[in-house]
Each structure stands twice: as C-alpha cells, then as structure tokens.
Amino acid sequence: MHLMEFPREVILGKNLIQEINNVIKRLKLGSPGLVVYGPITKKIAGSNVEKIVKEEFEVYSITVKEAHINEVERVISKIRDKGIKWAIAVGGGSIIDVTKLASFKMGIPFISFPTTASHDGIASANASIKGLNVKTSIKAKPPIAVIADIDVIKTAPKRYLAAGVGDIVSNITAVRDWKLAHKLKGEYFSEYAASLSLMSAKMVIRDAEIIRLGQDEGIRKVVKALISSGVAMSIAGSSRPASGAEHLFSHALDMLLDKPALHGEQTGIGTIIMAYLHGINWKKIRDTLKIVGAPTTAYELGIDPEIIIEALTIAHTIRPERYTILGKEGITREAAEKAAKITGVI
C-alpha cells in the first residue's frame, strides 16, 4: 500500500493572519487550539495569531526554544493536559518541526504558518529533531493547512530566502541520486514526484534575479517551490525527491559543528559539490546561489575547509540505507578535497 498525505489547504498571499479563523472553521478543527512559537517569532507574528484566534476559539500558547526532543515532549504535555484538538506552528523550521512531531505523536492536525521561506519542511511530512538517536529527519505527517503570509515572510532577513533557494536547488542532485538508487539498487522511483521536484528547482534557477530582490513576487516563487517540494515528498512517500547526498553532507556538518549554518545554506553548497560528482552543470547551480546571495564557499559559510572535507568523507555513513553518488564506501579524502577545490567551495 502506498499512502499519500497532503495539506488540505495551501493559502499564499498578504495579510493572512485575518484568514486563520476561516481556515479553522472550514476544516472543522474546533476548540481548544495551541499556538506554538519561538521567542522571536512570537513578536513577529505569534502574538497576533494568538490574539486573532482567541476572538473565536479557546486557545493556549507555548514558546519553543529549539528543535529538540525535550521541546517536543513539552508540547506533547501541553496538548495532553489541555485536551488540545489542533496546533498552529508560527515560525521557521525548528518551530514547525517540533509542532509537526508533537501533533503527529498525539494524533492531532497542525497548521503551518511559516515566518521564513528557508526550507521545504513548511509543507512536508518530515521533521529534523535533535536529541534522538537518528541523525537525519524523521517521518511524521504533513500539515493539514499551510498559511504563507508574504507580509510576514518579507520581514525575515534576506539570508533566509536565499537559504530556501539552496534547499530547492538540492532537488536536482537528490533526484539524480534517487535515479541512481533505482538503477543500481532497484529502489522504488516515482516519475511524477521526481518531475514535480525538478520543476521546483528549475523555476527558482530561472527566476533567480526576481528572487534576489526579496520582494513579493520572489517570495511567492520560493514559497510555491518549497511547498511543491513537500508535496513531491508526500507523493513519493519518502524524502527522496528532495534529499540526497547534499543533505547527508549537511547532516554531517550539523554533527561536526557546534553552530551550523542555515540548513539551506549547507545543502546549497552540498549541491554544488554533488553536481560536480554527478558530472552535471554545477556552475549553473553555483551561479544561481550567487545571484540570490546564498553562500557558495566554505569561507562565506564561516566553516573551516577541513570540516567541509571531513563532512564529505563521512556523509555516506549518515544514512547507510540511502544510496547516493557517494556510494556504499563513501569517497576518499583526496576525492573530497579535489571536488571541493574544483568547485571553488574551498
């Protein structure tokens, strides 16, 4: 059996905080609800969301500091104690991922209200949570609705939108890896999911100059592409259409660094290197990232070149069952250094 789950509603536009109660009514979610935000996203939109929802529904709130299993447990306790029927995540990747996993474990729906367009977790079923004995993302359920308010997303530093582009272009190498696993390992491959994923990447490459401006049109394009990536993963029933060796590289960096860069910044650089290994046009990917203002070198990422090389050599161990261009044995230090140098990453 192949189960596909998607958001029931995706709303993209301006001044959407006013629309939240209509979404809750249309989806018949009832009361009480839970607003989940971070210390910063509370100020950006969380308090406003809470105030609007309170006008028509009973609602509680909780502040989440990081994407850690302890925070997930705190949210679960709140859901249990207050008999919460649904949750709304107001924030970036961490807040959305914590809410996603907590609501999944408690069997309640959640609404995704992103404050940044920095990665494809805003509409996907996957959550990246620290403190578990898994090194990568875990599968939960996608949001029942996504409400992407351009006015809110626009207030985030441009760095976040550029990181979103980094996460989307990584679909190019992810699909290559997936095809490779299909050919060499007989892994299930969905032409439809792969096409949707690649289309998202092609669109942001084509519209990089518009995205660079950080205005409404560019934000709209990135958000649409991120949501399409999430839907592609739902169709595939796995993160395969949007996560390959470049994501393993990013997870390796997360393990090696005390303070990693943004997820999309790391996957963007990973994509340049993996595209080189695949023998495809890595310069086009690098140029796109440069146009939107995303980092393309270790120096711009603020990461020691030595760490880049190490991450490349250990990336294959992160998810041994996920076959990629790195192969089962990984790549040698020499090959890693050569790839990083040729692509100008180090």
Curated annotation (Swiss-Prot):
Reactions catalysed, as given in the entry: sn-glycerol 1-phosphate + NAD(+) = dihydroxyacetone phosphate + NADH + H(+); sn-glycerol 1-phosphate + NADP(+) = dihydroxyacetone phosphate + NADPH + H(+)
GO-annotated cellular components: cytoplasm
Residues binding Zn(2+): 167, 247, 263
BP terms from Gene Ontology: glycerophospholipid metabolic process; phospholipid biosynthetic process
Binding site for substrate: 120, 167, 251
Cofactor(s) this protein requires: Zn(2+)
Pathway per the UniProt entry: Membrane lipid metabolism; glycerophospholipid metabolism
Compartments (UniProt record): Cytoplasm
Any matching Pfam family: Fe-ADH_2
Cofactor note: Binds 1 zinc ion per subunit.
E.C. numbers: 1.1.1.261
UniProt xrefs under CDD domains: Gro1PDH (cd08173)
UniProt main location, coarse: cytoplasm
One function term, GO molecular function aspect: glycerol-1-phosphate dehydrogenase (NAD+) activity
Residues that bind NAD(+): 93-97, 115-118, 124
This protein's UniProt keywords: Cytoplasm, Lipid biosynthesis, Lipid metabolism, Metal-binding, NAD, NADP, Oxidoreductase, Phospholipid biosynthesis, Phospholipid metabolism, Zinc
UniProt keyword Transcription regulation present: no
Protein family: Belongs to the glycerol-1-phosphate dehydrogenase family.
UniProt cross-references to PANTHER family, sorted A to Z: GLYCEROL DEHYDROGENASE, GLYCEROL DEHYDROGENASE 1
Function text: Catalyzes the NAD(P)H-dependent reduction of dihydroxyacetonephosphate (DHAP or glycerone phosphate) to glycerol 1-phosphate (G1P). The G1P thus generated is used as the glycerophosphate backbone of phospholipids in the cellular membranes of Archaea.
Name this polypeptide is given: Glycerol-1-phosphate dehydrogenase [NAD(P)+]
Species for this entry: Pyrococcus horikoshii (strain ATCC 700860 / DSM 12428 / JCM 9974 / NBRC 100139 / OT-3)
